[in-house]
Structure formats: C-alpha cells, structure tokens
Amino acid sequence: MRFSILTLFPEMFAPLQASILGRGQKSGRLDLNLVQIRDFATDRHQNVDDTPFGGGPGMVLKPDILSHALRATLQGETAHVVYMSPQGSRFDQATAQRLAGYGHVVLLCGRYEGVDERFIDAHVDEELSVGDFVLTGGELPAMMVVDAVSRMVPGVLGDLESAQADSFQTGLLDHPHYTRPAHWVVDGDHYGAPEVLLSGNHGAIAEWRRRQALLRTLIRRPDLLGKAPLSRVEKRLIEALAVDLDALENKH
C-alpha cells in the first residue's frame, strides 16, 4: 500500500521509518512518499500561502500550488485524497479499515488558517479529523492515520491476531494484559496476575478476557456498546454489570 503525504514539513515524518512501519517499508508492503509542497511554488520566495479574501487573521494555502503538487504526485494515476482537517469526519478504526482497502492514499497536511476551499472541492475525496481539538498542522494527524491504516495491511504486523484483537476491532475496548512476573511487589504493595490467566484453561481465559473487555468498555466508553456485536448472554451480562456499578456508586 502506498501513502503520499503533501506537507510543508516532511522532516516531521522521520519516526515512521522506525519499528513496525519501518519494517513494513523495507519489506515492500508499505510505500511512504513525502511531498514538499513548497517545491511547487512559482515565485522566487517560494510562497505557498496568501492572505484570506474578506480579511481576517492567518494565511491560507493556495489552491494552484496544491493542485500542482497533487498532480505531480499522482502522475495520471488515481488515489483516494484525504485532507486532515478539524472540520472533517471523526477518524476511527472503521475508517482505518476502509482506507486500508485503497492501493494509494494521499494525505494533505494543512497549515496556518487552512486550505483554499476550491482545492477541496476540486480534488479532496474526504476530510478527516482525529479529535475535537486544534493542532498547529495536519502532520501529527496524518502520522496517526498512516500508523492505524498500516496495521490493517496484510503482512505489516508479524501477528495478524494481534491486529484483530486490538481495541475497537471487536467494537469494544481491549481487555487488560499481564506478563511475567506473576507476582510483583512495589513499595510494599503486592500485585498478582489474575489466576485464570495462569491456569492454562483456554476457554476460561477467553471468557475472562471477553468479560473484562465488556466491563472496561461499560466503564470507560459506554457509547461503544450500542455498536458492538453482542450476544444475548453478553447483553444480559452488561445489564447486570451496570446494576452493580450503579449500586457501587450509590454507596459512595
């Protein structure tokens, strides 16, 4: 899968050469193409922005320069063009899975006051936001998208089961994880791993993990439960857990 990133700060993407994504690029499963927007400026000062029509603070990225950068990147081929924007739809795991189905995704990183709307109308397939907050540019959100989508590309993760068991893949938050030592003491306090995980009973372990995922989601992200594929037994379990939590809160 190929990612092309249109940005004024390509040096910010160096971390994508490390760890799993770096190995994915070396193996040829991922291709990361960084495009410096300023290379397509037409004046000697390499200006890529201008003041907004109608007045107001800040600068706006110019549509003609962005269009030249995009066309040079595509070279006549097609791609799914995404603009990272606070006005975009919320990026989530389902979106990551969908984007992984494209052979080539172009990510435009905005700066300053944003991008001329005419470029969006002419070239952008969708706008995505990573949350209800404002950053100095679209580079960090673009890195998040590349990371999340790359995990869905076959062969990038060494263990496909790891991606399938991630939070949100099943519609729920992930269950707690434990490793050695089984018994840990810190500052005089004793912390033990759950006995069921040490039992070797795979059925009991799977049941415990599912129950913990349900409980964690109920406590931290109850909004997800309405979308998760749950059995009748799990729905009744959630109702019982909710009653127990309400009773516990009322005690305090």
From Swiss-Prot:
Annotated keywords: Cytoplasm, Methyltransferase, S-adenosyl-L-methionine, Transferase, tRNA processing
Keyword Methyltransferase: yes
GO terms under cellular component: cytosol
Principal location listed in the UniProt entry: cytoplasm
Catalytic activity: guanosine(37) in tRNA + S-adenosyl-L-methionine = N(1)-methylguanosine(37) in tRNA + S-adenosyl-L-homocysteine + H(+)
Example of a GO biological process term: tRNA N1-guanine methylation
GO MF annotations in UniProt: tRNA (guanine(37)-N1)-methyltransferase activity
Location of the protein in the cell: Cytoplasm
Any Pfam family hit: tRNA_m1G_MT
Top enzyme class: transferase
Top-level taxon in the UniProt lineage: Bacteria
Gene3D superfamilies xref list: 3.40.1280.10, tRNA(m1g37)methyltransferase, domain 2 (1.10.1270.20)
Record's function text: Specifically methylates guanosine-37 in various tRNAs.
This protein's name: tRNA (guanine-N(1)-)-methyltransferase
Organism field: Magnetococcus marinus (strain ATCC BAA-1437 / JCM 17883 / MC-1)
Highest classification ranks of the organism: Bacteria, Pseudomonadati, Pseudomonadota, Alphaproteobacteria, Magnetococcales
